[in-house]
Amino acid sequence: MKEIIFTEKAPKPIGPYSQGVKVGDILYVSGQIPVDPKTNEVVGKNIEEQTIRVIENIKAVLEAAGYMLDDVVMSFVYLKDIKDFQRFNEVYSKYFSNKPPARVTVEVSRLPRDVLIEITVIAQKS
């Protein structure tokens, strides 16, 4: 059975999708961009600031479903410029230092609202 996850602590969806969907013990978190959930404005002028906001948004959806970052088993990262890869990794590694999840990182030509990064994750309860 599918359970829809929603929290005011993450940005409202900007299209016909859910912030998260839980099926059994697996949680699928939709792509998060660096939008402040209180103002609905893009935050951060650089990849470091935007990465922090994105991961904080992901944490909010995870926590709304009773999960934590340690439960993330896979992440998909979309960067507007692959030259930001190293700087992105420096921030990402602070959140996923203990048993980091599997990950795919790709460069894309454009992201919603012209942000620098979008991340989606899959989490599973142990």
Swiss-Prot record:
GO terms for cellular component: cytosol. It comes from the Archaea. InterPro entries: RidA, RidA_CS, RutC-like_sf, YjgF/YER057c/UK114. Pfam families: Ribonuc_L-PSP. Gene3D superfamilies: RutC-like (3.30.1330.40). GO terms for molecular function: deaminase activity. Belongs to the RutC family. This is RutC family protein SSO3206. The lineage of its organism: Archaea, Thermoproteota, Thermoprotei, Sulfolobales, Sulfolobaceae.
